[in-house]
Amino acid sequence: MLTICTQVPSEFQTQVPSFANPPTLTMAVTDFIARLKARTSTPSDADLGMDAGIQAVFSDAPAGIPGNQHLESPELAMAYLKSIYGPLKRHYDWFRRTQRGQIKQYARTARSRTEAYRWRGRSQMHVLTSGMDDYPRGPPHAGELHLDLISWMGYFTKTMKDIAGFVGETEDEASFIEIEKAIVQNLDGN
């Protein structure tokens, strides 16, 4: 039987607890929340008084599209988001802790002294953790920062802010707002 490990060079198979990959799964959560907000902010046909004769025509239609239950039920959506919030927040905190870059050690000027990041697991030829291992980069330096990771952290922070706001974690939401602002200011240089 052919396994994935036989196709990947052994030096790329090792997993290290401080190496992170882009938090791409948060994109699905961001989209889910956007779809929830779109559903709740748009008035239904019944709200607009336009459902009178339509129900009879579609009375044999299924109640909902399979897989959309969480979008159709605010209670299910809230329960789901609350169930993933804690583990996702732990992952976010781990990401910030393990991928933090150095600013003051290299006399850099930045609005925020804490919101700078660099990929760990860098070699002379590869930055496998970034997801762009063939992207050309200069020789590694202990003080380097990575724009792609700083941008990912801005996106991850925005996702966490949106979830916190949606599930009522107002203190966390306020914290994420400040972190997001600091990341954006560091990216903009303002």
Enumerate the predicted regions with their spans.
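Tryptophan-centric aromatic hotspots in well-structured domains and transmembrane helices
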Residues: M1, Q13, M27, H91-Q99, ...
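Substrate-binding groove/exosite segments of carbohydrate-active enzymes
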Residues: M1-T30, A34, S41, L145-L147
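Alpha-helix capping and helix-loop boundary segments enriched in small/acidic/polar residues
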Residues: F12-A20, E75, A79, R137-S151, ...
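A structural signal for well-ordered alpha-helical segments within the folded catalytic domains
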Residues: P23, M27-T30, G86-K89, L147, ...
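Secondary-structure transition/capping motifs at alpha-helix termini
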Residues: F32-R39, T170, N190
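Active-site acid/base region of carbohydrate-active enzymes
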Residues: L36-L147
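Catalytic cores of carbohydrate-active enzymes
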Residues: R96-R113, S151-N190
